[in-house]
Amino acid sequence: GLFKTLIKGAGKMLGHVAKQFLGSQGQPES
């Protein structure tokens, strides 16, 4: 239970970070 929740949370966070990273590729860092 807890382990699965941690994995899910980590995946969500990684997805968010990846989105931010990919989104910043076409824009200059501010």
UniProtKB/Swiss-Prot annotation:
The record's subcellular locations are: Secreted
Secreted is among the record's keywords = yes
Biological process terms from the Gene Ontology for this record are:
defense response to bacterium; innate immune response; killing of cells of another organism
**Keywords in alphabetical order:** Amphibian defense peptide, Antibiotic, Antimicrobial, Cytolysis, Hemolysis, Immunity, Innate immunity, Secreted
Cellular component GO terms, alphabetical: extracellular region
Tissue specificity as recorded in UniProt: Expressed by the skin glands.
The signal peptide here is none
What does the protein in this record do? Answer: Antimicrobial peptide, active against the Gram-positive bacterium S.aureus, the Gram-negative bacteria E.coli and P.aeruginosa, and the yeasts C.albicans and P.brasiliensis. Has hemolytic activity (100% hemolysis at 128 ug/ml).
Q: What is stated as this protein's family in its record?
A: Belongs to the frog skin active peptide (FSAP) family. Dermaseptin subfamily.
* Name the UniProt record assigns to this protein: Dermaseptin-3
